Amino acid sequence: AHVAMLLGAAAVLSRVRDRLPGTVVFIFQPSEETPPGGALAMINEGVLDAPKVDAIFGLHVFPGEVGRLDYRAGPIMAS
Protein backbone atom coordinates (compact mmCIF):
# COMPACT_ATOMS: atom_id res chain seq x y z
CA ALA A 1 0.00 0.00 0.00
CA HIS A 2 2.88 2.41 0.73
CA VAL A 3 4.21 2.39 -2.83
CA ALA A 4 0.72 2.60 -4.36
CA MET A 5 -0.14 5.65 -2.24
CA LEU A 6 3.06 7.49 -3.11
CA LEU A 7 2.71 6.66 -6.81
CA GLY A 8 -0.90 7.90 -6.64
CA ALA A 9 0.22 11.17 -5.03
CA ALA A 10 2.92 11.54 -7.69
CA ALA A 11 0.36 11.02 -10.46
CA VAL A 12 -2.02 13.62 -9.00
CA LEU A 13 0.68 16.21 -8.25
CA SER A 14 2.29 15.77 -11.67
CA ARG A 15 -0.99 16.93 -13.24
CA VAL A 16 -0.84 20.22 -11.32
CA ARG A 17 2.92 20.72 -11.23
CA ASP A 18 2.66 24.09 -12.99
CA ARG A 19 0.65 25.36 -9.99
CA LEU A 20 3.09 24.09 -7.35
CA PRO A 21 5.83 26.43 -6.19
CA GLY A 22 9.18 24.78 -5.61
CA THR A 23 10.19 21.19 -6.21
CA VAL A 24 8.44 18.06 -4.98
CA VAL A 25 10.59 14.96 -4.46
CA PHE A 26 9.05 11.52 -3.96
CA ILE A 27 11.23 9.30 -1.77
CA PHE A 28 10.65 5.56 -1.62
CA GLN A 29 12.41 4.16 1.45
CA PRO A 30 13.59 0.55 1.23
CA SER A 31 13.23 -1.73 4.25
CA GLU A 32 11.15 0.80 6.17
CA GLU A 33 9.65 -1.85 8.42
CA THR A 34 12.75 -4.03 8.85
CA PRO A 35 15.57 -2.99 11.20
CA PRO A 36 17.79 -1.15 10.62
CA GLY A 37 15.63 0.25 7.80
CA GLY A 38 16.83 2.09 4.75
CA ALA A 39 16.50 5.74 5.81
CA LEU A 40 19.97 6.24 7.25
CA ALA A 41 21.65 4.72 4.20
CA MET A 42 19.59 6.97 1.92
CA ILE A 43 20.49 10.06 3.97
CA ASN A 44 24.17 9.09 3.96
CA GLU A 45 24.01 8.75 0.17
CA GLY A 46 22.57 12.27 -0.20
CA VAL A 47 18.87 11.73 -0.87
CA LEU A 48 18.10 14.98 0.99
CA ASP A 49 20.84 17.02 -0.68
CA ALA A 50 20.10 17.25 -4.41
CA PRO A 51 17.70 18.89 -4.61
CA LYS A 52 17.89 20.13 -1.02
CA VAL A 53 14.87 18.96 0.95
CA ASP A 54 13.27 21.61 3.20
CA ALA A 55 10.35 19.53 4.49
CA ILE A 56 9.20 15.93 4.47
CA PHE A 57 5.69 14.54 4.75
CA GLY A 58 5.56 10.86 5.62
CA LEU A 59 2.72 8.40 5.43
CA HIS A 60 2.19 5.00 6.96
CA VAL A 61 -0.55 2.43 6.75
CA PHE A 62 -1.98 1.82 10.20
CA PRO A 63 -5.24 0.13 11.18
CA GLY A 64 -7.80 2.59 12.43
CA GLU A 65 -11.29 3.93 11.98
CA VAL A 66 -12.45 3.90 8.34
CA GLY A 67 -12.58 7.40 6.89
CA ARG A 68 -10.36 8.89 9.57
CA LEU A 69 -6.93 10.42 9.01
CA ASP A 70 -4.61 10.89 11.98
CA TYR A 71 -1.67 13.26 11.80
CA ARG A 72 0.81 15.11 13.97
CA ALA A 73 3.83 17.34 13.65
CA GLY A 74 7.25 16.04 14.63
CA PRO A 75 8.68 12.55 14.93
CA ILE A 76 6.43 9.54 15.23
CA MET A 77 7.05 5.78 15.11
CA ALA A 78 10.50 5.07 13.62
CA SER A 79 11.12 8.62 12.41
Where do the PLM segments sit?
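Histidine/acidic-residue-rich, glycine-tolerant segments that coordinate divalent metal ions
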Residues: 1, 7, 13, 19-79
